[in-house]
Amino acid sequence: MDREQMDREQMEYVLSGIGPRRQAFNRALTDGLEFMGGWLRRHWLALVNGVLITYIGLAILTPVAFAFGLDGPATAVFHVYRFFCDELPTHSFYIFGYQICLCQRCLAIYTSMLLSGITLAVLRKRREVPSITWWMWVLAMVPMAMDGGTQLFGLRESNVWLRLLTGTVFGVGTALFLLPQIQKSAEDEPLSAPIALQ
């Protein structure tokens, strides 16, 4: 911040009756928010990939926790995942005889999104990765909707390979639709609008 702008800002504070402690707080808060925004713009993909690794990792480690007798924490994690996945026993993988917290399709979706995110992290340093269009993303959803829908209405029973394949197609499609758009948005210059705290 240059001297003239600082003097103008000081004058605005004086005219509005904001004391020196509040001025210091406002400056510290503004600087902190700018730092966090800059950090997120630079490291958003690592954050997304980290969340996916944690989400998939917890789902896979829960049956391991059951096998080692950690029933309390494992049960808690299993119940939390119920909000995000149907966890049908017939549609899930098992480790040590205990069910993974995600069904086969959801596991394929999130794993393929993670692998796509890692691929984007490598490729984005070399060239721009274009986003697919929204209608291509909808097309990526169609096989999963058909497989799940026909099974839901009792027309046929899906199998593990179809669940994995349709989940992977949707996961890759979602990653190719969202991640390049977030990347482009993160590269754009942030709007420099003043933050008014009173």
What are these regions (language model features)?
Residues 102-121:
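Hydrophobic alpha-helical transmembrane segments
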Residues 51-59, 112-116, 131-153:
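Small-polar-interrupted transmembrane alpha-helices in polytopic inner-membrane proteins
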Residues 88-104, 145-170:
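Interfacial helix-loop-helix junctions of multi-pass membrane proteins
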Residues 42-72:
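N-terminal signal-anchor transmembrane alpha helix
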Residues 67-102:
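Extracytosolic (periplasmic/ER-lumenal) interhelical loops and adjacent juxtamembrane/interface segments
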Residues 187-198:
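Short, highly charged, low-complexity non-transmembrane loops/tails of multi-pass membrane proteins
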Residues 111-116, 168-185:
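Hydrophobic cores of alpha-helical transmembrane segments in multi-pass inner/ER membrane proteins
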Residues 28-41:
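Cytosolic juxtamembrane amphipathic/interface segments immediately preceding
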